Amino acid sequence: DMMILLSAFCNFYPYARSIVLGEDWPDTKTFYRKRAARILPSYYFMLAIDLFFYILPGHKYRNVGALCKDIVTHVFCVAPNWSDTYISTSFNGVLWTVQMEVIYYLLLPWIARLFRKWAFATYSVMLMISVTSTAVILNCFAGKERNYGNNILTFMGIYANGMLCCILYVMWKKYVTENKYSRLAGTVISVLCIFLMNGMIHKYDGDVNLQAVQLQSRLVQSFLFALFLFSTACAGEYYQKLYSNRVASLFCKFSYNLYLWHQMIAVWLKEKRIPYWSGDTPPNMTGDRVWQWKYQILIIVVSAAVAVA
């Protein structure tokens, strides 16, 4: 959820500058072309690897119809709209978030135009879409939140908060004269947000109905993360270096591929019993901390190597 809000902030930034500062309006075709070049090649490559080296050799589908539906919905980035192509898919489990982003990219230039004319009304409608869809799922599909909870409607409020945060940040930079006190306040608020977000996450950790709790708290958590994002952007220079430095810049160059590959590699390593484990119950379910640390480090190292390659 946090990465989706961050994506909303970053992709809306040129539009926010145009709205607030009067800069040239971003060209829609150029935006689509850049976004497609950024995410689709790696995404489709991952689909192909999944299909030809895992799904087809392993005969993962009971019939051709189910296989074709899963392929088509993943190719067109609409798989989360059906529970069988979302929950029961044999494709890489992280790909649904990429599909969510693709839909947002398609909508963003048009939502931005609405923001330019009716900012408050557009933001309010996006929030209401998120609140209403969440309420419908929680009340009409109780116990099936995992099947229906992650879609563009429930995430609409997350995108709205990211876009609002972006506009407020551009306005802050234009109208507010920053000083050591404002930067100190930004730093303190940012650190406080970290503790609050950590507390919120641990509060529902282990809940028997985790998906329902996550869905209920999604919007509130997005407000908190938006505040963290805004305050960090307005914080002191030395504090900002924790997030903006050469290591972070290097990581950004391959972070998308790392995200795409990490789960597939994690599953493959465990299936191949690397690091080695015996018995029928995986060590992550028996509390073997030593194995878990080895496994975690191996996932990071192998995933990073594949992502860079």
Task: Place the predicted regions along the sequence by residue.
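Specific transmembrane alpha-helix
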Residues: 1-16, 97-113, 126-178, 194-199, ...
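Transmembrane alpha-helical segments and their boundary/interface "anchor" motifs
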Residues: 4, 16-55, 64-74, 103-105, ...
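Transmembrane helix-loop junctions in multipass membrane proteins, especially transporters and channels
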Residues: 17-22, 54-63, 117-121, 139-145, ...
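Membrane-interfacial, low-structure loops and terminal tails that flank and connect transmembrane helices
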Residues: 21-30, 173-181, 243-244, 279-286
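Membrane-interface helix-loop-helix regions
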Residues: 24-33, 39-100, 131-145, 157, ...
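Hydrophobic, aromatic-rich alpha-helical transmembrane segments
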Residues: 28, 32, 36, 67, ...
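Membrane-interfacial entry segments at the cytosolic side of transmembrane helices
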Residues: 117-125, 176-188, 291
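Alpha-helical transmembrane segments of multi-pass integral membrane proteins
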Residues: 159, 186-309
